[in-house]
Structure formats: C-alpha cells, structure tokens
Amino acid sequence: MGVRMLACVILGFLAVAINCDEAPNITADATTITTTRKPIPYQDSNICKLCKCEDTKVNCYDQSITTFFTLNEWEDIIDLKPSTVDLSENRFTNITVIADLTIEVLNLSRCSIEFIQSGSFRDLQEMRVLDLSHNKLTTDKLSPHAFEGRFAPEEYEPLASMRILNLAYNDLHSLNQDLFEHMPELEELDLSGNPLTTIDHVTLVAISSLPMLKVLRLRSCELDEIPSKFLHTPRFLENLDLSDNKLTIVPRELEEAKDLIYLNLNQNPIEVIDFYSEDNPGFPRLHKLQELHMCNMPKLRSIGPKALAGLESVEKLHISFNPSLSYLDPKALARPDDIGESFDWPLVKELYLKSNNLTEVDTRLLSRWDLLEKVDVSDNPFLCDCSTQWMVDVLAPIVESKGSNATLMVCQEPIEMRGHTMKDLHDSHRTMRCVDKYGHRPEKDGAILLGTLIGVLLAVPIMLSLMLLWRRGYFAWLGLRPPADVSRAFYKRAPADDILY
C-alpha cells in the first residue's frame, strides 16, 4: 500500500513538471495567434475607405480626420506601395509611428499638429519630402527624436533619403541644436513664418549642422540681423530667402555664402544702399549670384554708385514696387576693372524697375541694353526732356519688342508733356527739349510776349483818345481843365489902381 502511494505521488510530481515545462510554448503559440493579422486587400483598408487610393497615391486632403492612422492601418496599404501621401487640412494633433512603406512625399500641413512621437518616420527610408508647415509645433515639443531613424546597436540610423523639410508657419522661437542630426543630407529647409525674432546660438548650431543645405527660407521671421558665421558652414547654399523681415541694411554676412545664386530681400525696411557708407553698405562680393529681388520696400529711397557692384554675374534684377525709390545711380552696377582704368558691368538679361518713383532710367545703368530678354520700367513718373531722349529713341522700342507695353512708360514732367507715352513720342519722332537748369519755363515766354504786345497795341490808341477828350474839356466836371483855360489864367490883366512897390 505504501509503495503504491509513493508511486502515485511521484507520478503526480512528474505530471506537474511536464505541464509546467510545456506552458511557455503554449503561451507563446497563443501570443503568436493573437498578434498575427490576416492581410486584407488595400482597397478594403480603413485608409482607402476614408481617402482616395490610386496610382501609388493616397489623397486624404480635407477629410476631417481627427485621429492619426495606427500602425496596423498603415500596414494594410503595404501592397499599394504608396509614393505620395497627402494628409493636409485635417484635424489630428499627434503623429504616431508609420509602417515600413515606400512613401517618398508626405504632406502633413495644416493639421494643427502639436506633437510628433519619437521615431514616427523611422521606417520611411525612401521619404524625400516632409511637409509639416502651418501646424502648432513649438520649440519644447519638437524633439530631435521625432526624426530619428531605425535603431542600430551603436546609434540611430539617419533618414538617409530626406532632402526637403518644411517647418514653415509653426510656433518655433528657437531650434534644438540637434534637431537635424538624423538628416545629414537635407538640402532644403523652410522656416518661414516662425517667430524666431533672432537667430540664437542653438538655432545657429542646428542650421550649421546641415553641410549639404542648398535652399534656406527665412521669410517673415521678424529678424533684424543675421549673426556672424551663420552662413559659413552651409557652403553649398544657393537659394536664400530673407524677405519680409526687419533688416535695415544689406547683411555683410552674405559674403560667407560663396555659392549663392538666388537672394530675396523683399519687404525689408532698408532705406539706402551706398557702397561708400559704413551705416548703409552696398552688397558684398557675390560673384555667383544670378537673381536678386528687392521689391515692396516702402522705405527704400536711394541706390548709390557701386551699391550693386559686387553682383558680378547677376542676370535677373527685380527692383519694383518701391514707392520712395527716386534715385538709382547710373553706376550702381558698375565695378572697376582689374586695371582700374574703366568699368565692367554684368550682362543683365531681365530688368524689372516697375512702379518706383524714378524720373529717369540712365543709359549708363547697363552696358548692353540690346541683350535684355525681358524688361519692365513702367509706372514711373518720368521726366521727358533731352536727358531721357534715349529712352524714347532706344529703350521704348526694346520694351515693345520684348513683349512689354511701352505705352505704360508715361511722361509726368514737364507739364506740357504730362500724359504723353514714350511709345507715341517715338512713333512721332519727337525731339524733346532740355529743362532749364534753374526751373525757368521758356515754353511760357511766347504767351507772355504776345500778351505784352497786345497790351501795348491797345494802350496806345486808348491813351491818345483820352488825351483828345481831355483837350476838348470833356473832363472839366472832374476838375481837369483843358489846356486853353489854363493858359489864359497865366496872362490876366492887373487892375489900374494896383500900387507898385
């Protein structure tokens, strides 16, 4: 009996041991079963029910989506192999991890996004363009971890394909100095519309960490200066937009951008650009710059000699809609040659001087007007005299031949020329006179001389008639006696009883 009891106890322990040993495998199998999802056609996915999915494009524009898609929902469209995903104009505020997809362009603009989870884009290894503009991202909530790549034993892998990042019109007052550490190949960065006010040290470090940067947009960032060495590291920078800021002078730091091709300084409160001024210096030497924009600058009054001389290769010059710009020096673009005996000019192909306050465009501004491909100098209060005769004879035909309207080149002064167009003056072969140096108006002399002559011719017979009437006594009632009465009064006989002394 005792032996049987012992055998039963031993068998019981063995059974428990066997069950305990098999339990993990059972649990593991159960877990596998619960986590494995049955694949579905991408047409039946939740994403493609809410959005339009076709031709490797997912269009979710303005679909009132309030919650970002889950990882599983993204996995359901793997077979679609999407290259472009547009989720703009929706209402979600948080971004979570996206599945391993072939997305190249991802648009998340205008969605009120406030937070991006760490590693949200880590599996998008083919993504080239990411648009996060017009959201509510702040300096505190935009972490470098948001852009980290896949995990590796030593460090996170970069988002190697990323080339364009748009962070415009968020609420960024500064940038984390490591914000772009996972995007070493980034070529285009847009920070426009963020209230940076100034480029502090950490922001400078962040942007300086992008050695391959080619395009930088800082429009409407309330900047009043550009810090030293800001443009030193991005040595391949070609396109720089500093428009609509508070710059009062042309930044000297531009000389660090040796490869700059395009520069936009529109809507800045610059008043004077003068090569010889320390307070308002001209442009530094930018020998590769091809296109310059200085438009809609209400305070710009004067562009002096050699102010633009540093722009040796400029081809497109936009200086329009500056209502106070009344002086553009004839040698604004001229630079001394290597010998110093003469001047060289850039070969400008497109010149826009529309809607300024210029009274003339000097022929010396360019060396080869005939090489212009586009030109617009309309809507300026031109002085039409001998100094602008060349505009009538040469410039007006050039403007007309390039597709612009020369009838918009209208004379404002002198008064007798007001309203005449330079095209009409050219067609009528009009030769304009020189305005008097002291402001005299000889064109009015004829009227004055004619009036004087008429006055003299009328005054002589009138005076003769009055003299005749006076001699005949017609004005006696006025106390004006005729000459006969006066002469008789001189010889009146004296009385006989007058006593002589």
Predicted segment positions?
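Extracellular leucine-rich repeat
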Residues: 2-501
